[in-house]
Structures are given as structure tokens and as C-alpha cells.
Swiss-Prot record:
Protein name: S-adenosylmethionine synthase
Record-linked HAMAP family: S_AdoMet_synth1
InterPro entries the record matches: ADOMET_SYNTHASE_CS, S-AdoMet_synt_C, S-AdoMet_synt_central, S-AdoMet_synt_N, S-AdoMet_synthetase, S-AdoMet_synthetase_sfam
Positions of Mg(2+) binding: D18
Cellular compartment(s): Cytoplasm
Organism: Coxiella burnetii (strain RSA 331 / Henzerling II)
GO biological process: one-carbon metabolic process; S-adenosylmethionine biosynthetic process
Length: 393
């Protein structure tokens, strides 16, 4: 008997106000970590109408022009016209930045790199599945690709009436756990006032949705909802306040996996909210790529100032080819999940973070995304005593 279910994930464009804030936070981090790899950064941003407020705790020997970094980021996104109500040339930039608490420094710094203590307590999840060629859930993968396509057509001038703010939502139909069709696709995009709704709908379906979605998933039952409220001229930080760290499900697995609650952007890799989640994805992806399971979720947890994880757990949702206890043993044998070793293994002390702030931190194929490597898949497969796996990444 066929078991049919629906699952939905959403994504947002680089011009969405929360993503504007994420990009500012990570742009500041990149500017500092490139000069001072041992900097400690926790940088938050709030954006609204004509103002950006940047705040946080930063301890570093480097210097960065936070105001200019903020303006450049806003302009690069596409908010470069006063008529939009928010632009990088004229917006006010207010900063309130202090230093990291010395109580935290005691537990994190001043040790050998491999014994670097976790920057805070917390729990993180990593996930991978065989649904897509990038070992990610299909709904979030295609939701990201839709808003990336919107940005591409906006920036290259093919659809000049597009504006920076946009959201996508993809509902896929699953049969026996595998995606087989698109049930509903929502694409809401900010636009200039002169474009008609009829022309906008036609262009979005033909130029954004159809080139991205697999054609065999689109049938007579697929619903296309383009700007469902009609007009979307006012958008970005004029329409909504944006805040760093408010799109944590968009940043990860679109709701297909659990989330520990900590955001990524604006945090240097001593913060395990970020580095621990990246490592958990690295572990889960190698387990799936190695053929040990078709789906895998890893949980890892830490205590502030302590290097060793307080727990590691594995869930394979009944798809494991070997016992989960054995998978957990293999993780401990082949992955060092102390923060200092994660940073070293994944080469995280680099200016790579602004690129992660849009279109998801996982399922990316750019070389900077070192946690997407499957270099341990074959090692895990052999250690598990399994036949050759089909490793595609």
C-alpha cells in the first residue's frame, strides 16, 4: 500500500530583512577573522526602514569599519535606491559593541587548540538524506534554488521589475518516503509598481519556477501561488523589521530535522552553535554518503568551557544498514568533535561566512563549505563492513 504524505519548506531571498541582518553580521565577522583568526565575535544586527543597528561583543586585535561594511553589504544586496525606502548610501548606522565577558574568556581561551572549550552550552543537530544529489531534503533544496533564481534574474536585468525581497515555499508529495511531485509552490516577490499582476505571475512561473523545479514533478494538480495577496511593492526593511538569527529553519533543513535553537550568523567558530552544527552536518552527510543509512540525524551537545561533547546521539529513522550503536561508535572513532579540532578539520578560521548567510548553510557545493565534504564516506563504509556505496559528492 502506498503511503502518501506532504511536506513543506520555505526559503527567503538575500533581500529579506532578516537575511539583510544575517549578511551584515557575517560580513563583520569576515572582516575581522581574516585579520585575526583568534577573534571572538558575537555580532547582531537590526534593520528597519532607514536604520541599521549593529550590536554585540567583539574581542580582537583587528580593526574593521563596521559602518562601511554595513553600507557595502546593503548596497550589494540591491538596496541602492532611496525610492525603495532603504538604501546603503543614506541609511543611519548605529553601533553598540562591547568585549566578550572575561568570565567566558576563562573557559574558552588560553588553552591548547585541541582543548579549546566550547563558547557556550547547547545542543546542535546535523542531518543528511538521499533525497537530492547534495544529500539534503528536497523541499528546502528547491525552495533555496527558487529564491536564488529570483536574485539572479533581478541582478542580470532579465526581469528588471524585480526587487530584493522575496520568499518561496515548496510543498512536495511523498510516496513511501520519496518525493514524487510538487503539490504547491508559493513565490512572493517584491516588485516595482508598474508591472501588472498578470505579467508578473506569468514571468515568475516561466522564468523562475519552471527552470528550477524538476519537470516531472509539475503536473495538472500542482498549484502555483504567485504573490497571493496581489501587490508587493513595499518590502525589505521598510515592510518588516529584520533581525540576525531569525531564519534558523531556512538556514538548516527546512523543518525536516530538529534544531537546537542557536543561530549561526555573526558568530565566530568558537561558538558551537555554529561549528558544532557544521560538524554534525559533516558527520551525518558522510554516514549517508558512505551507505550506512539513507537518512541520518546527529545530535551533539556541549557545556561551556568544556572541550569534549557532553553527548552524541544518532537517529537513522529505520534506514540504517547497521545498528545505530555501531554508527555511534564509528563516529567517536573517526570524528573528533572537540571545538578546536572541528575548527582545524573544517578550516573554519577564514573569511567564509558571508556566503553562508543566504540560501542555506548546508547542501552547498562551493569549496568554502568544507563541512559538505564526503571525504570520510569510504572510510566509514569499510569500517562498517558494507559493500561499495554510491558517493556522488
Amino acid at each position: 500500500m502506498t503511503h502518501t504524505t506532504l511536506f513543506t519548506s520555505e526559503s527567503v531571498s538575500e533581500g529579506h530583512p532578516d537575511k539583510v541582518a544575517d549578511q551584515i553580521s557575517d560580513a563583520v565577522l569576515d572582516a575581522l577573522i581574516g585579520q585575526d583568526p583568534n577573534c571572538r565575535v558575537a555580532c547582531e544586527a537590526v534593520v528597519k526602514s532607514g536604520m541599521v543597528f549593529v550590536a554585540g561583543e567583539i574581542t580582537t586585535n583587528a580593526w574593521a569599519d563596521v559602518e562601511q561594511i554595513t553600507r557595502n553589504t546593503v548596497l550589494q544586496i540591491g538596496y541602492n535606491d532611496p525610492h525603495l525606502g532603504f538604501d546603503g548610501e543614506t541609511c543611519a548606522v548605529v553601533t553598540a559593541i562591547g568585549k566578550q565577558s572575561p568570565d567566558i574568556v576563562m573557559g574558552v581561551d588560553g588553552r591548547e587548540d585541541q582543548e579549546l572549550g566550547a563558547g557556550d552550552q547547547g545542543l546542535m543537530f546535523g542531518y543528511a538524506s538521499r533525497e537530492t544529489d547534495v544529500f539534503m531534503p528536497a523541499p528546502i533544496t528547491y525552495a533555496h534554488r527558487l529564491v536564488r533564481q529570483q536574485a539572479l534574474l533581478r541582478k542580470n536585468g532579465r526581469l528588471p521589475w524585480l526587487r530584493p525581497d522575496a520568499k518561496s515555499q515548496v510543498t512536495l508529495r511523498y510516496e513511501n518516503g520519496k518525493p514524487v511531485a510538487a503539490d504547491c509552490i508559493v513565490l512572493s516577490t517584491q516588485h516595482s509598481p508598474e508591472i501588472s499582476q498578470e505579467s508578473l505571475r506569468e514571468a515568475v512561473i516561466d522564468e523562475i519556477i519552471k527552470p528550477i523545479m524538476p519537470p516531472h514533478w509539475l503536473d495538472k494538480h500542482t498549484r502555483f501561488l504567485v504573490n497571493p495577496t496581489g501587490r508587493f511593492v513595499i518590502g525589505g526593511p521598510v515592510g518588516d523589521c529584520g533581525l540576525t538569527g531569525r531564519k534558523i529553519i531556512v538556514d538548516t533543513y527546512g523543518g525536516m530535522a530538529r534544531h537546537g535553537g542557536g543561530c549561526f550568523s555573526g558568530k565566530d567558530p568558537s561558538k558551537v552553535d555554529r561549528s558544532g552544527a557544521y560538524a554534525a552536518r559533516y558527520v551525518a552527510k558522510n554516514i549517508v554518503a558512505g551507505g550506512l543509512a539513507d537518512r541520518c540525524e546527529i545530535q551533539v551537545s556541549y557545556a561551556i568551557g568544556v572541550a569534549e561533547p557532553t553527548s552524541i546521539s544518532v537517529e537513522t529513522f529505520g534506514t540504517g544498514k547497521i545498528d545505530e550503536v555501531r554508527i555511534q561508535q564509528l563516529i567517536k572513532e573517526h570524528f573528533d568533535l572537540r571545538p578546536g579540532k572541528i575548527i582545524e578539520e573544517l578550516n573554519l578560521l577564514r573569511s567564509i561566512y558571508k556566503a553562508t548567510a543566504t540560501y542555506g548553510h548546508f547542501g552547498r557545493e562551493e569549496p568554502e563549505f568544507t563541512w559538505e565534504r564526503t571525504d570520510k564516506a569510504e572510510i566509514l563504509r569499510e569500517a562498517a563492513g558494507l559493500a561499495a556505496a554510491n558517493v556522488t559528492n
